[in-house]
């Protein structure tokens, strides 16, 4: 058996160093097979809503997300103009005149409802929709739940990925975020929550502007990680139905990320992911887990260590799915991203609906703007 392994390793290494052109005759049904593959391919749309959501999709366009349509949605025309996306939608033109929602979630909600037809057209045909935003402002907080509800009613697996505001951003944004998160959790199959305050535990001396960029990057990694396990050829890919099984009606989810380049890199990366400050919950009751393993040269033994470690820490009946992406730029590092679903979180309770923040709390200072 060992000799067989050595022979395979030698052959593959030889093939990688000396690429040979091999002419493979085309089968008569190849074209038909290509059409079928194209038809059954999962159609994934990523919708960034509001300022933070648009920052996230802008970053996604920079790094690239294989097999996803990127859509930017905002009430602020000036901000939307700067964003890179496959499609842009300025919502609430009548209500906001392209000037934004003024930190009022009610205006964001009404803007999305006003532009329902455009949003539905953009979501048409999607099998899976990611809705990403930063909660606490007006557009993301108000419009994201409306968009998520539309996507879900249209039959798409709907996963929202959101950040909660830093404490330093004030009580008004915190109240807005609480209201928006409860509505979003009800509108989505799964909502992945990233508390920005937890970033400060990782790097307490991080400059404010850099902290926001780190939050954006975590959103990007979450969406890109899940999407490319389905769409991008890798060492081990996930079937869309596997992802649906874990995230359909998955409730509240949280994410942990870890990486290591030591001798025990696999186990250390898994431990870091599950002990990440971002994963601020007891995961022993988690009903599902999605594991994304990335590295330049991930070994089978290492993948097994990671999967076994995560499986031991969640509910014994939890559905655990995993995939491996080859990322040459990681060199000797293994990165592990774990998303646990069906958890109980202090950030979301469904005992009562939080009322929309009062006008006094949310209305910005009135500025007379002359009619153009």
UniProtKB/Swiss-Prot annotation:
Residues 352-372 are annotated as: Disordered. CDD domains: FtsZ_type1. GO terms for molecular function: GTP binding; GTPase activity. Pfam families: FtsZ_C, Tubulin. One of its GO terms (cellular component) is cell division site. Belongs to the FtsZ family. NCBIfam families: ftsZ (TIGR00065). This is Cell division protein FtsZ 1. The gene is ftsZ1.
